[in-house]
Amino acid sequence: MAIDLQQDYFSLFGMPRRFRIDESALEAAWHGLQGEVHPDRFAHLPDVEKRRSMQWATRVNEGFRVLRKPLSRAQYLLELAGVDAAIDTNTAMSPEFLMEQMEWREAVEEARAAGEVDELEQLHLRLRQHSREVHAGLADALDDAGDYPAAAETVRRLMFIEKLQHEIDDALEALEN
């Protein structure tokens, strides 16, 4: 078996180039490819073949890691479309979103400072629901509208949301210990 190391991850796994994917089919394709390219299958072959199998296995695992998570999958789709989401440099967000983030952060900090585990758990649930809504908007922007600038902004929003979810998790862990 030979893997084209130049093909995109969607092609590698036989998936359509879309944000909405069948995650079970992705996992099944990953397991199938892993079985074909696993370095143990090439242990008896010359070093050049062993190295090639390591490259293939690395490519398969990296592709799965990227496509498995919605946020990295969206970033990858933007990259394939030639859109720079400017994740590291463009943090400009709408005033409404920034105000919303400030409110979320204040609520988390107040609950943390007061030691209110129940309130933090409620905030986590509300934020998870909000994240689902934003993901749905991202799917619409990428798959239905092909609106890459909106998708790039939504990716940046999701990064804020994901970071806040981790902060809530950390606060809960600190309070429960």
Swiss-Prot record:
Transmembrane regions listed in the UniProt entry: none
GO molecular function list: ATPase activator activity; protein-folding chaperone binding
Domain J: 8-80
Any Pfam family: HSCB_C
Swiss-Prot/TrEMBL GO biological process terms: [2Fe-2S] cluster assembly; protein complex oligomerization; protein folding
Keyword tRNA processing found: no
InterPro entries given in the database record: HscB, HscB_C_sf, HscB_oligo_C, J_dom_sf
Protein's job: Co-chaperone involved in the maturation of iron-sulfur cluster-containing proteins. Seems to help targeting proteins to be folded toward HscA.
PANTHER family per the UniProt record, alphabetical: IRON-SULFUR CLUSTER CO-CHAPERONE PROTEIN HSCB
Protein name from the UniProt record: Co-chaperone protein HscB homolog
Annotated organism of origin: Azoarcus sp. (strain BH72)
